Amino acid sequence: MKLHELHDNPGANRKKKRVARGPGSGKGKTAGRGIKGQTSRSGVALNGYEGGQMPLYRRLPKRGFSKPNRLEFAVVNLGQLQAFVDAGKLDAKADVTEDALVAAGVIRRKLDGVRVLAKGEIKAALNLSVAGASKAAVEAIEKAGGKITVSRPAKEAAAAE
């Protein structure tokens, strides 16, 4: 197979139908919109408008709420940490902080802090300093000979003061 032999399957690309371009096109005059009425005109009704009937989104009750100052954590699994140590992107001997995880590319940004979860296995003895960790993750890290320091997220600490 060569580059010049590549082409779409028959019928994969359809030409766009040009409307309102005379009677010969088959879609002239009313352009497939029918005659008169709201939908024949520009600016058709808004989605969710049911012609004056009480709309569905108002018939149903409100539920729940969004916590405005909710903390959002970047999640890191033990398997990810081990993979980055094996690849040489994370130094197991040095202290592993949230900033070090961002620099190594384990996470893109730390949000309100980093939370370590126990998915996967860890063999490296890491000295971690993060904002949160599950009990299983703490046990696994300590079992591997590492140490984990869980500090409160900066946002939470500021709110407590």
Swiss-Prot record:
Record-linked PROSITE patterns: RIBOSOMAL_L15 (PS00475)
Organism: Paracoccus denitrificans (strain Pd 1222)
Cellular component aspect of the GO annotation: large ribosomal subunit
Name recorded for this polypeptide: Large ribosomal subunit protein uL15
Biological process, per Gene Ontology: translation
Keyword match rRNA-binding: yes
Positions of region (Disordered): 1-47
Organism superkingdom: Bacteria
Database matches in HAMAP family: Ribosomal_uL15 (MF_01341)
Residues making up the signal peptide according to the UniProt record: none
Extent of Gly residues compositional bias: 23-35
Name of the gene this protein is made from: rplO
Matches recorded under PANTHER family: 50S RIBOSOMAL PROTEIN L15 (PTHR12934), LARGE RIBOSOMAL SUBUNIT PROTEIN UL15M (PTHR12934:SF11)
InterPro entries, A to Z: Ribosomal_uL15, Ribosomal_uL15/eL18, Ribosomal_uL15/eL18_sf, Ribosomal_uL15_bac-type, Ribosomal_uL15_CS
